[in-house]
């Protein structure tokens, strides 16, 4: 199954004990990364600013070297619907819930 069609997580990274905002899943520091690759249509959550480059590199290896990745921050406790709204704002396309991939504990 290709990543573009998979609802399974493609990686896991632990939240740090401190963070500017809270993860809606685990309460740790949370930064949202949106993959806006034209062919994947994925919304990807990335926790912890300090691991951004590591995870971004992993994502690029998984979904293709040229896949653009755009970062944005959501408020604490924001759920999937808001993530999808922000994804639409950046891309003009909707992202079904099954296309969400989370990095977390």
UniProtKB/Swiss-Prot annotation:
Top EC group: hydrolase
Keywords of the record: Endonuclease, Hydrolase, Nuclease, Toxin-antitoxin system
UniProt GO molecular function: endonuclease activity
EC number: 3.1.-.-
Assembly notes: Forms a complex with cognate antitoxin MazE8.
Physiological role: Putative toxic component of a type II toxin-antitoxin (TA) system. Acts as an endoribonuclease. Neutralized by coexpression with cognate antitoxin MazE8.
Name of the molecule in the record: Putative toxin MazF8
Gene name of the encoded protein: mazF8
């Amino acid at each position: 199954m290709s990543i573009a069609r998979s609802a399974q997580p493609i990686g896991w990274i632990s939240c740090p004990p401190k963070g500017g905002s809270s993860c809606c899943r685990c309460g740790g520091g949370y930064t949202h990364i949106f993959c806006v690759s034209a062919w994947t249509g994925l919304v990807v959550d990335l926790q912890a600013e300090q691991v951004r480059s590591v995870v971004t590199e992993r994502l690029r290896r998984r979904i293709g070297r040229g896949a653009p990745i755009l970062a944005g921050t959501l408020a604490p406790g924001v759920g999937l619907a808001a993530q999808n709204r922000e994804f639409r704002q950046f891309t003009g396309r909707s992202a079904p819930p099954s296309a969400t991939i989370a990095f977390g504990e």
